[in-house]
Regions:
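Nucleotide-activated chemistry modules centered on ATP-dependent adenylation/adenylyltransferase
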Residues: 2-409
Length: 409
């Protein structure tokens, strides 16, 4: 009986070419596994394609709800954004994919897991750190780093290899954008984006989102409610998290929300440029933040922001299955206990405009915030506070005056 390998399979040219290569190079039985994180119609026809390419079996695992609730929401609650722009769409998906690959490898008794990530990108790190953390005994095969036996460098090479092995599938020989899509976002790299001086060709590029200048001339109001930091209703209708994200994608896409052009610092040291469409995610993050500012005290909000930035780095670097990620998430979960309430905002030509928020746990006190005198706050109380709060500044200034006077003698 042949040993088995589980291949992370997308149905694209790279992973299709890997199937006969694994059989030819290692004499493995190839079990393909496609993890459905919300790719949509990209999954159509995969079973036939995998088997025509030589796989003995294809698993299509729907993890959309798990991805939404256990991977997306911890990052939303933390406000995790990498380098102030990137909402971690690809980064959050890789650990759930790694988890399912390991589960299927265990079920099939496979000795190895194979992925098609290149040797220059972040995904190789994310996949392999996840697999190492969950199954240190399982071998990982990364063809693009095995240049002694993987000789295909270009798309044309892969097409020729497939054809030579009897795989005649309708792959496009032309170069196109490199895209990664899931429920949360779609990323675009390649072509004109490789030169950061070029403006993206948005008419050809965008998939989910209308360019803001072409969005409707009339704004649209949206209302959301949250319980303990988790979205529960959208425009009065109760939904699962995944359903809310799906609907927000439609609304945000219609109004040109969530297009980001970023030059980011990859884990491997190089800079890369990409355009990300995250319409629903951008709205959800903004709505959650809008409610938090009403509820969390200053020091908690500040500390949470710092840890949110740290979590973004941890997730981006593929360190989901670590004590550090668990510890950050535990802190964030405590802060979310009272993040309950309603937010309202208007979507208009790429903008999310606040239109009110309320919460039974709001720390906003109108009598305190107003400029009139109230029972809870006496303007005279500020005298003592400013004296003490400014004491270090005053002491330093006095010392500087003393030193200057002595120097002038």
């Amino acid at each position: 009986m042949k040993e088995k390998v589980v291949l992370a399979y997308s149905g694209g040219l790279d992973t299709t070419a890997i199937i006969p290569w694994l059989k030819e190079t290692f004499d493995y039985e190839v079990i393909c596994c496609c993890i459905d994180c919300g790719q949509g119609n990209e999954l159509v026809g995969l079973d036939e394609r995998a088997k025509l390419s030589g796989a003995s079996k294809l698993y299509i695992e729907n993890v959309i709800d798990e991805f939404s609730e256990d991977f997306i929401m911890p990052c939303v609650k933390a406000g995790a954004v990498y380098e102030n722009k990137y909402l971690l769409g690809t980064s959050m998906a890789r650990p759930v994919i790694a988890k399912k690959l390991v589960e299927i490898a265990r079920k099939e008794g496979a000795v190895a897991i194979c992925h098609g990530a290149t040797g220059k990108g972040n995904d190789q790190i994310r996949f392999e750190l996840g697999i190492k953390a969950l199954a240190p005994d399982i071998k990982v095969i990364a063809p693009w780093r095995m240049t002694d036996v993987w000789t295909m460098q270009y798309r044309e090479d892969e097409l020729a290899y497939c054809k030579a092995h009897g795989i005649d599938l309708p792959f496009d020989a032309n170069h196109s954008y490199s895209r990664d899509r899931n429920l949360w976002h779609i990323s675009h790299e390649g072509l004109e984006l490789e030169d950061p001086s070029n403006e993206p060709n948005y008419d050809d590029l965008l998939v989910l989102t209308t360019p803001p200048e072409k969005a409707p001339d009339e704004g649209e109001y949206v209302t959301m409610t949250f319980e303990a930091g988790v979205p529960k209703t959208l425009n009065g209708k109760e939904m699962k998290v995944s359903e809310i994200i799906t609907e927000l994608n439609k609304l945000g896409g219609k109004h040109g929300i969530g297009i980001v052009d970023i030059v980011e610092n990859r884990v491997v040291g190089m800079k890369s440029r990409g355009v990300y469409e995250t319409p629903g995610g951008t709205i959800l993050m903004a709505a959650h933040e809008q409610l938090e500012e009403l509820i969390l005290d200053r020091e908690t909000l500040k500390t949470k922001k710092d840890l949110g930035n740290l979590l973004a780095e941890v997730v981006y670097e593929g360190k989901w299955y670590t004590p550090l990620r668990e510890a950050i998430q535990a802190f964030v979960d405590v802060t979310q206990k009272y993040v309950t309430g309603e937010v309202k905002f208007k979507l208009f030509k790429g903008n999310i405009i606040k239109a009110g928020e309320s919460s039974p746990y709001s720390l906003y006190n109108e009598s305190l915030a107003s400029f009139t005198t109230g029972d809870l706050y006496d303007h005279h109380d500020a005298d003592g506070f400013i004296t003490l709060f400014g004491l270090p500044l005053k002491v330093r200034a006095m010392k500087m005056q003393e030193l200057e006077k002595n120097n002038n003698k």
